[in-house]
Amino acid sequence: MDFIPSFWIILLRCFSTVRLEIKNEVVIKDPKEQSLRKILNFGHTIGHAVESFYLESADKENLTHGEAIAIGMVCEAYLSNKLLNFPSDKLIEIKEVVLRIYNKIQLLDNNFNAIIDLLKHDKKNVNGQVNFVLLNDYEDFELDCKVSTELIVESFKFYNL
């Protein structure tokens, strides 16, 4: 049976030293990021855009890489719920776990467009299209998912609730 990490192991790889062992096993199985390795990108598409936005200006609060990826995980779980019917109870569970680990950093409405513009520069984009790894369930994911700008904005608003 092929190694497919559960969602909680994926979550741990973002927040603990266990992540290196998991990442190494996934990278060994998919060294060219053709399929399985892409699961390591869950939360990173939005997370990297949020991180870049906060790094652009000294007047914004400090944001760690982990905090940015945590925001991305909540937003991308929301997108998973809306597009792939990822269970609502698991969406809430992800948000609650993330907010137990990190303090909430409010994403201001007037910053949404700037963050979305930064998404367009993600290295995983193909032909100008932002690609997401989204969840059907904790151990079932879809690669290269396309998402509308409106739904991305909705995910920011969900995170802010």
What is the meaning of each model-derived region?
Residues 4-113:
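Active-site segments that bind and position negatively charged phosphate/pyrophosphate groups
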Residues 1:
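A glycine/threonine-rich phosphate-anchoring loop and its flanking beta-alpha core
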Residues 86-161:
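C-terminal charged capping/lid subdomain of soluble metabolic enzymes
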